[in-house]
């Protein structure tokens, strides 16, 4: 049986890490696409030359033409400029919006049946623009944010409690930015909710609040440490979890930037919520109950995303007609 084809649009740090992970997991054959000549070809050849050592048979190629996307079952989009120190995700808006228009047109022409995962920041606005530009069904276009933010939250909690990351579950909803909403009441260690762990004396509410703040600033913390770029290992691993759930019909419940059409009281927007990803794409939106401060924080986050989308509409009004 022929292997699935996975197209990586953008061959920077995340793109290269994605290609390597796909090879190691043998999720499919990889085509790396980038407008920079030589970069996708060089990276794919380098990774391919590691295959005899690591023992995988997935094929990797590089290309500078959108035609190379033809037949891809999954497209993962990282194209655009990365965030630099002192730069907010919002600063990236006008530059990366133009990139999403071009990428959307390329996917529409050559891989209209693909499952599309967007990683480009500012995420919630870019995945919205990508769906509009491509005209693809909303259930087949998602943004990678919540899996990454939740993974950071889980890591910090596991470190705090000195337990395995495998026994920590956590949900981070809302926009992928400073207004994201780490949900304490839906986060657990071995099924025990965080509020109960506070009562048990494992930690304090003040310490949980510090971890929530660190999660919100997780991306900026890495940007400030690296000084020349942004995170790429954890974002790539997060996107792979989403792609694998689609390709293997695993139906995992993952927090993703998904298109909402009335769910959570939100319409015509992409916002981070729990979804089931299977062979049909986003098969279900898990509309968990939000109340009190959680609802207030979620609504504030939605407002921040709406501001970005409104800015997109002003910059590229033609997107609304697509």
Swiss-Prot record:
Gene Ontology MF term list: L-lactate dehydrogenase activity; L-malate dehydrogenase (NAD+) activity
Entry-linked Pfam families: Ldh_1_C (PF02866), Ldh_1_N (PF00056)
Active site: 176 (proton acceptor)
CDD domains assigned: LDH-like_MDH
InterPro entries for this protein: L-lactate/malate_DH (IPR001557), Lactate/malate_DH_C (IPR022383), Lactate/malate_DH_N (IPR001236), Lactate_DH/Glyco_Ohase_4_C (IPR015955), Malate_DH_type3 (IPR011275), NAD(P)-bd_dom_sf (IPR036291)
Superkingdom as given in the UniProt entry: Bacteria
GO BP annotation list: lactate metabolic process; tricarboxylic acid cycle
Keywords linked to the UniProt accession: NAD, Oxidoreductase, Tricarboxylic acid cycle
Catalytic activity: (S)-malate + NAD(+) = oxaloacetate + NADH + H(+)
This enzyme's EC code(s): 1.1.1.37
Residues holding NAD(+): 10-15, 34, 96, 119-121
Residues holding substrate: 83, 89, 121, 152
PANTHER family, alphabetized: L-2-HYDROXYCARBOXYLATE DEHYDROGENASE (NAD(P)(+)), L-LACTATE DEHYDROGENASE
HAMAP family: Malate_dehydrog_3
Family under the similarity heading: Belongs to the LDH/MDH superfamily. MDH type 3 family.
Function as written in the Swiss-Prot or TrEMBL entry: Catalyzes the reversible oxidation of malate to oxaloacetate.
Name by which UniProt lists this protein: Malate dehydrogenase
Organism, as annotated: Nitrobacter hamburgensis (strain DSM 10229 / NCIMB 13809 / X14)
Taxonomic lineage: Bacteria, Pseudomonadati, Pseudomonadota, Alphaproteobacteria, Hyphomicrobiales
Gene that encodes the chain: mdh
